[in-house]
Amino acid sequence: VFTEVMVSTDDQEIAEIAQRYGTKVPFMRSPEMSSDMAMTAPVLIEVMNKYKELGKVFEQLCCIYPTAPFISAQRLNQAMTLLISEKVDGVLPIVQYSYPPQRCLLMRENRAKMLYPENYNVRSQDLEPIYHDCGQFYCLRTDSLFAEQKLFCQNTLPIVIPESEAQDIDNEEDWKMAEIKFRMLRGEQTR
């Protein structure tokens, strides 16, 4: 589904590992795009500009996050197919919140307060489902990325995935949850 797979990094060790497994690292990421505060859209714009300098132009791109262990080839193929066939700016996987955010609470002066008190007497199952980006991948038209300078473009199509396929890994607890989901997806007993 992809004509080229590359890793964007500023770390030589990561670059060497990526290349050992057959991934291209045609250039290193700039220091400006390597800080903990760097956002993904500017990194992708830098990557596309560097490719253009090398004489390569891509009409579409797909950014895959390394912290998302349950991405499948089928989902990536589905997303790229939708991106092209539906003529949208982007496609991203989303997952329904496990509990309705309309019933969320804020802490004010050491007290719990409903953010949306009008939903106090509404059953959670009667509230409209709300979804969030599950942080796995973004498939985009390159011209839309450049025009809008963001990952979530105006005309973005979602792919709703089950909670069992969504797990971002940012800390040790996330890792443990990923292990549980992995065993569950493989049909193994969880401990």
Residue ranges, per PLM feature:
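Short, high-confidence coil segments that cap the C-terminus of an alpha-helix
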Residues: 2, 56-58, 85-88
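Short active-site oxyanion
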Residues: 2-6, 89, 164-165
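Short beta-strand scaffold positions
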Residues: 8-9, 139, 169
